Amino acid sequence: MRVKKLFPLISGLALAACAAGPDYRAPAPAALAVPAAWSDGSAAPEADAALAEWWRVYNDPVLDGLVARAVESNLDIAQAVSRLRQARESLRQSQADFLPSVSASGSGGRNFREGAADNSSYSLGADASWEIDLFGGTRRAVEASRADLAAAGYSLANVRAAIIAETVSNYVTARLAQERLRIARDTLKTVEDNYDIARWRVQAGLVSSLDAEQARAQLAQNRASIPSIEQSLAGALNRIAVLTGDAPGAATRALETAAPIPAAPDAITAGIPADTLRQRPDVRQAERVLAAATARIGVAESALYPSLRISGNVGTSALSLGSLGDVITGGLFASIGQLIFDGGATASRVRAQKAAAEGAFASYKASVLGALEDVENALVALRAARERQVQFTEAYDAANTSAILARSQYQAGLTDFRTLLSAEQSLLSARQGLADADADEVFAAAQLYSALGGGWQTMNPIDGWQPE
């Protein structure tokens, strides 16, 4: 009867329960200063499939293989997966607070006393305790943990996208270094020929030794440029090895065979800013961090309100194992607690959590503005790289023609070596500039795809979390 009398009280309190703290609502775009369109007016959305696996637009099987290895074996991604699993376990721990805790115990013993018969005693018992979530503190804790899990998932997605972008960037750096090596070695052969011609003309008495010395200086300068390019190539290959989870060396040996710089797609559409923000994992992570901080205000506030705990126990004891259960005893208890005074510590924790939520909102808005900045910068970089390509293509054509004419005229004795040297330097500068512009276009395209939030949408579910 006593047990039955407790249920109406518990039910009434449960029905009257409410969740402490504010309900979370995602900030409106207007509060985040999100524009309706990009400054260049582009608005057509990029296809989801192209954005999710954007590196495939370069049509480079070697690059595709490197990205696959990085996604599979990169250690930064592995660390992010571990953090996601920790967040999943934290959520499970929070959810467990909804349920009672039950423990059991048992004992047995035998007493010996001289001159008296031995006797034994045995007991079994169980204790249960349940704190009813009257004011939603546990609900808010679960809400916060669920948001933390989503934030950890989007953090993983952000790491994945960043590793893919870095792999592509280092691959292009390696191919650019190989192209610059090819240019340097081609130029070196030409300079060696010029040196031979200059020496012959000096020996023939046609010119002074100044031509030979100028040619020798040009030859040494071109030879000196090669080691720094080789260093750049080695650095890019070593970084690719680490990104793919390997030690530098054999892992990237196949990349030592030169290949052209991959070509960027003709057109990349940016969509509208609001769509980009939904695609950016770092922005979505920041939004979930804000949701978790808001929920924790309720966790802190719930400590200001009364708490209700139900506890009980049941047990049996006997002098023999066979008699256990013959007599069962137990009890059921309810207790209500209310904080009276703690020097303002609990109220201070509420204020601190509100401040944390304000900081999380500022961080979220900063992520939004940073994402918008990334896209705008990438659009400008891509446009500038393509303009440089056009100009360097024209410069290369003109410099190549000029160098051919200068070389033939010098061989015929119609011009001096300084004119030839100037023409050769202009050709080298134009070739290097065109190679840099080609690579810059690919860098800018990769920067734009990354800024638009590409590279994570096809992730497989991990430990119960999957992108929404």
Predicted features by range, described:
Residues V202-L206, Y410-L414, A451-G455:
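A short glycine-centered flexible hinge/capping loop motif at secondary-structure junctions
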Residues A20, E53, N59-V62, L66-R69, ...:
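Small/polar-residue-enriched beta-strand and adjacent coil segments characteristic
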Residues R2-E72, R146, E230-R278, R284, ...:
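Terminal intrinsically disordered/low-complexity segments used for targeting and assembly
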Residues T138, Y154-I272, A381, A385, ...:
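Periplasmic alpha-helical coiled-coil/stalk elements that build and connect Gram-negative outer-membrane
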Residues E89, A96, Y154, A161, ...:
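Regular, well-ordered alpha-helical segments
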